[in-house]
């Protein structure tokens, strides 16, 4: 705990509080020309999009400047990283400025799609001298500007504060999801006994999630020209769940993307019954949505594992620095060995994520009112990963303070 009271940490923490204040202020700035007395005309898709945006720093409840949140930016980052892993495309070899420019263009496209889909289904009210087309264009631009403002805010927080984009997402989750869970408890009229059992289960699950999050498989690595007494401190760590809780957060967002396209098509073809059926079929709580959600978690768990631990890059780095794994030849053999282990633990992590966060949501197929409660395990895993990420950042910033002077 002493690490959190270092001057550098306190300074960064204060900057983060300032940025969070700006974020909260932005969530109170309502979009112009929106009739807030009426619910957004999104039919059964509102629940799906509400939770997807809340997990990405957005907020569809108040229809504010930051309603879209960081979803376009984080989605573009994920898509770029998945393609950058391939050496054939050569994306990782491009200059950093070119990579950043292309990522931001991809963000622009995704932000445009999401903003248009939301605006087309908002209860807009005409103003004197302003036609509806102008109002739609204006609100779309405001939502896109809000997304890019949040990106700029997270960049500032990454440079001057703690947590980067994590803090924005955590603020969004803390602001709305606990209240939603409490509303569900009151709506379902859950007894005190069941609440006590849920609390005990939550504590047990919290312990299990933290244990799995910090569990690692260590591969001893030998370093040439380093004395043997340091050998025991040289390891290549692979986490039991290499992807962490990120697949859960991204899965909710990616599964909601078809909803945005369907909302746009439904606006253009309001009489199309087939589109309405697809919207209902892909709404949260339907069997099709549930299967797509589990499949997305599984695929993302594998993808994030290889994004976080690239056997090609590690093998190349070890070969250049004179490191090698015991009984494994450098180069191709090392790459295959590491990729094999990553594949094994990625599969373990994928099934673990599906078991812990996916299966509890089966109750939603019976009664959609249990949605918020069934999401608690997944939210815990996302939150735990974020907390440990901030903890690791604090430890890295205070690393030099742990050593005593030799003089």
From Swiss-Prot:
A matching Pfam family: SecY
Record flagged with keyword Transferase: no
Cellular localisation: Cell membrane
Cysteine-cysteine disulfides: none
Topological type in the membrane: Multi-pass membrane protein
InterPro entries in the cross-refs: SecY/SEC61-alpha, SecY2, SecY_dom_sf
Keyword Secreted in record: no
Spans through the membrane: 13-33, 65-85, 104-124, 133-153, 158-178, 190-210, 248-268, 287-307, 345-365, 370-390
Cross-referenced SUPFAM superfamilies: Preprotein translocase SecY subunit (SSF103491)
GO annotations of cellular component type: plasma membrane
GO biological process: intracellular protein transmembrane transport; protein targeting
Keywords: Cell membrane, Membrane, Protein transport, Translocation, Transmembrane, Transmembrane helix, Transport
Highest taxon in the source lineage: Bacteria
Subunit structure, interactors included: Component of the accessory SecA2/SecY2 protein translocase complex required to export cell wall proteins. May form heterotrimers with SecE and SecG subunits.
Function in brief: Part of the accessory SecA2/SecY2 system specifically required for export of possible cell wall proteins. The central subunit of a protein translocation channel.
Family note: Belongs to the SecY/SEC61-alpha family. SecY2 subfamily.
Protein name: Accessory Sec system protein translocase subunit SecY2
Organism of this sequence: Streptococcus sanguinis (strain SK36)
């Amino acid at each position: 705990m002493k690490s959190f009271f270092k001057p550098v940490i306190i300074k960064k923490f204060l900057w983060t509080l300032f940025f969070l204040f700006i974020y909260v202020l932005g969530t109170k700035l309502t979009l112009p020309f929106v009739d807030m007395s009426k619910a957004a005309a999104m039919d059964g898709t509102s629940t799906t999009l509400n939770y997807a945006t809340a997990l990405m720093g957005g907020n569809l409840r108040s229809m504010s400047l930051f309603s879209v949140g960081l979803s376009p930016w984080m989605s573009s980052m994920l898509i770029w990283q998945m393609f950058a892993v391939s050496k054939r495309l050569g994306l990782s070899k491009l200059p950093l400025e070119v990579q950043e420019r292309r990522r931001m263009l991809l963000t622009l496209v995704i932000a445009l799609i999401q903003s248009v889909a939301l605006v087309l289904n908002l209860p807009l009210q005409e103003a004197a001298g302003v036609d509806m087309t102008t109002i739609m264009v204006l609100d779309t631009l405001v939502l896109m500007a809000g997304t890019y403002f949040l990106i700029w805010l997270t960049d500032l927080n990454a440079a001057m504060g703690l947590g980067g984009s994590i803090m924005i997402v955590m603020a969004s989750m803390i602001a709305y999801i606990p209240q939603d869970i409490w509303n569900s408890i009151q709506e379902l009229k859950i007894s005190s006994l069941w609440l006590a059992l849920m609390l005990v289960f939550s504590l047990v699950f919290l312990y299990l999630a933290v244990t799995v999050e910090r569990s690692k498989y260590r591969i001893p690595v030998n370093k040439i020209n380093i004395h043997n007494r340091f050998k025991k401190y040289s390891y290549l760590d692979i986490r039991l769940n290499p992807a962490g809780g990120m697949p859960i957060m991204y899965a909710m967002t990616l599964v909601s993307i078809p909803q945005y396209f369907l909302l746009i098509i439904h606006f253009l073809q309001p009489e199309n019954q087939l589109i309405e059926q697809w919207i209902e079929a892909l709404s949260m709580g339907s069997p099709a949505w549930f299967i797509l959600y589990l499949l997305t978690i599984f695929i993302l768990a594998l993808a994030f594992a290889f994004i976080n631990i690239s056997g090609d890059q590690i093998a190349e780095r070890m070969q250049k620095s004179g490191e090698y794994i015991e009984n494994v030849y450098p180069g191709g053999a090392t790459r295959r060995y590491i990729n094999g282990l990553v594949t094994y633990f990625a599969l373990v992590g994928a099934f673990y994520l599906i078991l812990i966060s996916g299966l509890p949501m089966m109750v939603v197929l019976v009664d959609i009112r249990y949605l918020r409660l069934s999401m608690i395990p997944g939210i815990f895993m996302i939150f735990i990963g974020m907390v440990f990420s901030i903890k690791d950042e604090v430890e890295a910033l205070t690393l030099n303070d742990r050593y005593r002077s030799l003089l």
